[in-house]
């Protein structure tokens, strides 16, 4: 019985980390496919948007928390067709933006359950 419990706790510890990394990896891929043209690969500037979107003194801070950023992305991004990306993909790309900004760390998951508690400065 002790072995079974140990195995269960070990699996619980492993799979969330993998799932968290999967969300970040998905966000990175979505950003590369849908966001790079306008915002640039480094979030600093692209063909359509010349203002950096993450980092010190950038536009991302105006959203105050992760939920505000997600809601903006949900309604308006990508600019050429917000319906091109489903809700889980928008959570993933929002996580990617927040990790690049330093508001979240790799290994964390972003969802409606925790987004309002994650400040953006």
What are these regions (language model features)?
Residues 28, 42-78:
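Gly/Gly-Pro-rich "capping" loops immediately C-terminal to redox-active cysteine motifs
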Residues 32, 82-121:
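Flexible coil segments in periplasmic/lumen-exposed cytochrome c-class electron-transfer proteins
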Residues 27-42, 93, 97:
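The canonical Cys-X-X-Cys-His
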Residues 13-30, 81:
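Electrostatic cytochrome c docking/interface patches
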Residues 22-23, 61-65, 85, 89:
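Extracytoplasmic/periplasmic, Sec-exported soluble proteins
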Residues 4-14:
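Bacterial N-terminal signal peptides
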